[in-house]
């Protein structure tokens, strides 16, 4: 069972003094996380293999003293969930704020309370600036879910807000960031830690192949099946930013948040997306299994969790925009002999879609290609034992389409903007757009 333990308050050596500390223990079947606070924002003091139930947390915390050297701040601290410049932190801060006049706000948070609310919620406050910050942690199998929420008594501008910041608790030697592009997805860039900051940001409003919101910490000898690995994923399909930093003290931190281009309006409450983290001692396969199990049990709708995944065939590369009922029937027959269980009709069946320069948004069957509609093809596909699927791209519109010509104000952005893939994006916040798409797609 997943367990949250609230240890009693105790005394232990943390920096060079004796400090009164709180500690909380979070357990999965294979991992233990110890969270502590010495009066400020909580921090992760331990994250590794599961500890015994009799582990002395005071003794454990006492085994993690900070080192001191010349030319640094006099008080050394662990990297907490949101280190701030107001605390004298000289690395990348976890929060950047300005008041209504653009003046910097340098928060100095004090720990207030920890509550069990669907997990653990840690509250810290800055009474002087009227700020409250909440760090929520919940357990999902072998995956930990982290999220930050900031509240302010007055409107402020948030230049940056990180999900709860995670230190490199496993002393990894390398990290893997994921990049790529179309037809070249999920390329692993395996890099060695070095002092300084690595920033990876998507400013395109989507996750993108170029800047996938994920990270893996590992050692040089970590393989698919053996060795230490920690996987991170920022659960946000829009613009995002990742910052990983090694400070001059040797400390390391991992930050994920929304792209800075999204933080330009005054607000009194803002939350990050959830960040999902899992540690494995069984290599890359271990974190893959943890995330896959989590997605199947808690992300997919319960109605889909145990359904079989049909092997499906997509006809795009076979025909592109040249649709013919005769050809598609022949292709479907070949597909079923190969073991396909679902046949998917891709782009080119609607509007006057003979190439990628027109008709997106005109979700009506092209009678030139399908004079009797799609029924003959669907019936044939079902008859030979396959499900039938069909391709839509409802959020997009072609400038050369009836939809755009009749409703040029339904797009995101200005009318004379640079196109991407010969298309524009519909503003799905507009009720008329929602109604139009629902009507057209449900009719098909």
Tell where the protein language model's regions lie, with residue ranges.
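Catalytic domains of carbohydrate-active enzymes, especially glycoside hydrolases
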Residues: 327-349
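Polysaccharide-binding surfaces and accessory modules of carbohydrate-active proteins
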Residues: 25, 31-33, 42-246
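Hydrophobic faces of well-ordered beta-strands that scaffold small-molecule active sites
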Residues: 311-314, 345, 388-392
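Conserved, mostly hydrophobic/aromatic
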Residues: 30, 148, 267, 313, ...
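Short Pro-Gly-centered flexible turn/kink motifs
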Residues: 106-109, 262-281
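Active-site-adjacent "subsite" loops/lids of carbohydrate-active enzymes
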Residues: 310, 317, 321, 394-444
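Aromatic- and acidic-residue-enriched carbohydrate-binding clefts of CAZyme catalytic domains
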Residues: 349-377, 401-428
């Amino acid at each position: 069972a997943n367990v949250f333990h609230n240890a009693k308050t105790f005394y232990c050596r943390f920096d060079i003094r004796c400090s009164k500390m709180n500690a909380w223990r979070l357990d999965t079947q294979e991992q233990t996380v110890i969270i502590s606070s010495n009066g400020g924002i909580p921090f992760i003091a331990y994250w590794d293999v599961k500890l015994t139930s009799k582990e002395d947390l005071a003794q454990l915390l006492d085994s993690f003293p900070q080192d001191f050297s010349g030319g640094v701040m006099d008080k050394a601290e662990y990297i907490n969930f949101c280190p701030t410049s107001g605390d004298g932190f000289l690395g990348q801060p976890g929060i950047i704020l300005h008041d209504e006049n653009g003046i910097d706000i340098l928060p100095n948070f004090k720990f207030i309370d920890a509550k069990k609310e669907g997990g653990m919620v840690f509250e810290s406050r800055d009474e002087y600036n009227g700020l409250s910050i909440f760090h929520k942690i919940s357990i999902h199998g072998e995956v930990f879910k982290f999220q930050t929420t900031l509240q302010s008594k007055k409107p402020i501008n948030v230049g940056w807000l990180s999900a709860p910041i995670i230190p490199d608790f496993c002393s990894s030697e390398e990290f893997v960031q994921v990049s790529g592009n179309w037809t070249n997805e999920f390329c692993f860039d395996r890099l060695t830690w070095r002092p300084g900051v690595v920033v990876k940001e998507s400013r395109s409003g989507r996750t993108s192949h170029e800047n996938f919101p994920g990270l893996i910490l590992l050692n040089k000898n970590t393989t698919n099946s053996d060795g230490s690995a920690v996987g991170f994923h920022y659960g946000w399909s829009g613009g995002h930013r990742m910052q990983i930093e090694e400070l001059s003290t040797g400390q390391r931190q991992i930050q994920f948040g929304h792209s800075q281009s999204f933080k330009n309006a005054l607000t009194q409450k803002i939350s990050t997306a959830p960040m999902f983290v899992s540690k494995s001692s069984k290599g890359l396969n271990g974190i893959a299994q943890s995330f896959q199990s989590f997605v199947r049990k808690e992300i997919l709708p319960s109605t889909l969790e145990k359904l079989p995944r049909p092997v499906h065939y997509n006809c795009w590369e076979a025909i592109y925009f040249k649709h013919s009922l005769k050809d598609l029937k022949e292709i479907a027959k070949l597909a079923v002999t190969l073991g396909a269980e679902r046949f998917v009709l891709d782009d080119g069946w609607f509007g006057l879609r003979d190439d990628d320069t027109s008709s997106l948004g005109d979700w009506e069957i092209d009678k030139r290609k399908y004079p009797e509609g799609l029924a003959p093809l669907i019936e044939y596909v079902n008859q030979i034992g396959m499900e039938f699927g069909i391709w839509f791209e409802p959020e997009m519109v072609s400038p050369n389409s009836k939809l755009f010509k009749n409703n040029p104000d339904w797009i995101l952005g200005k009318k004379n903007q640079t196109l991407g893939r010969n298309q524009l994006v519909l503003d799905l916040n507009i009720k008329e757009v929602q109604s139009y798409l629902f009507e057209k797609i449900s009719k098909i």
